[in-house]
């Protein structure tokens, strides 16, 4: 029930008495048929039959929507990774609001896939320049499969009135009630089986029309929900002159992660519906979310006058407290004092995680890598150490500049390698960046850094395997990248290298002597030149990336690309330029790549990445210029959908006119494993895949993969077989762990 009131000028308080009428549920004599069926089933069957009609009932609409979101920290551990979290040194208390925002937007929709959101006002507690949550997400239970968020369950959840819902749910009739003369049936919804993506709760269905009046549904962890412990959804629909529309939607998440317990509420209130708007041909462009100028500059008086849901006491206090703290935190003296505390030297950071120094008043950040990843061993340099600090200065908008000087020293070959990289990011409408790098450094023959150095150090020390193959080059690299709009991005890069071959050390260290094994030469055998004399190489590379239907968020000072549901296409052209600055190479090669993630609802997710390419000409080139593929000879996996998990690193490197690769994976996301007692409690998922390489009628190599993922949320284990005609089958196990090797 709504009632608009007017407050006279100067009037601070208005007494408005009201009486809530009782909600009376009528439970008439229940007639159970010969099959012993609850009367709720007859109502549900009629609702299922009408579901497609109501799903497609509204073709387009416009509305005003108010969104309020908050996230609350309910509890936290006394310590986290050895650091005390007592309130004295941890900026929190229990039941403290971590995030609070409000927005008011005009929402325009043209079914099935056109929408536009114009944010008229936005407010974030403690961030006067911030932009709040502004994307309306109407959960339609008229859909067969409810896709709440990929992180919650990539399979989605089955609607209680889906076409096949009777196979998933039990229903119980709990009576009827009347609202404005309309008879409404209350139905309790219960999952038939645990560990299925199903809802629990109440749906209220309008008699004779068999449409939803309101819902109160919940999801629990045993419904294969990720990240959260519970999620409650409440909706109310109301009639208008043009039809029934959603009025309110509230989502209540609740969870616990590493001892941090949190809860929240996300309210959406819809008003001023128009179910017959007139849209021009160009009304829906590639900008689906736009924050109007000054949308985050509204006064408190404005918000008090338009807010449909009053602030709670804790919310009002949070606004007052954080707005005051923001003014204090903008004081340079306060920021400097805070930096002095946070920038103190930490041995754990220096050794394991890296160290960051912030100068907030000057918008400067200096980052240092962890020592553990900066010292390595290989058979070319012996022990080597790298030091690469990064200095970043932020300006207004997306403008920033970063400088990364680097120095590397090989203790056995006594070679010092200094280099530097400078980057500048800019662009008001679309993202642009320009960068230059120069100096002397080590390059892998596969310049895409196919083998992490830390991983190679472990392989060399423990297994007497020196897979890392290096050469040295004096170089200069100049690159420019830009967003072009409509899902298009472009990058061009020029690089010049003076390449120098490097031999292994005369007597590299052998830490663990393996019988019948020795270090291999520092050449990417078997597919490259036997001779690698000193030479010069000038290359020009252009990359065009396109995702059709690419959408953007438009802020007052910049546009941000958010992609689309379409596949991503990448076209790459690379030219080895002969005689430029003494360049000795002469070749042209190309590649075309397409990749996508395809949600299959309850069936899981299918991902693929396919590439074809080759050399148009290969008049003269050296090992670094070959077409290389990402292989893997370690037990830790390389990036899925990018490389071959059992393939020796340079085995099929080539200069052929044509090649193609296909990587595909099918993630069951709980399908099948939710029927296996041990797996369903652990929430482990099955995954299967195939990787294929074809090289100009000379090579056909295939890997078949079956694995288990979502182990402790972050791990994956794969069993892989590799097949090549005329060769024994390769078999191996690969483990995916949340560790980034450098």
Language-model features: locations:
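Periplasm-facing N-terminal accessory domains of Gram-negative outer-membrane beta-barrel systems
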Residues: 1-29, 33
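Structured extracytoplasmic
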Residues: 24-25, 31-184, 190-198, 258-376, ...
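Short loop/turn motifs that connect adjacent beta-strands in outer-membrane beta-barrel proteins
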Residues: 55-57, 345-348, 356-366, 379, ...
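Transmembrane beta-barrel strands of outer-membrane/channel proteins
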Residues: 65-67, 389, 405-409, 434-442, ...
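Transmembrane beta-strand segments that form the barrel wall of outer-membrane beta-barrel proteins
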Residues: 216-221, 366-377, 393, 398-422, ...
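Residues that define the transmembrane beta-barrel architecture of outer-membrane proteins
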Residues: 229, 381-385, 414-418, 472-476, ...
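Outer-membrane beta-barrel strand-turn architecture
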Residues: 393-397, 426-430, 482-486, 548-550, ...
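C-terminal outer-membrane beta-barrel translocator/porin domains of Gram-negative envelope proteins
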Residues: 433-454, 458-471, 530, 568-672
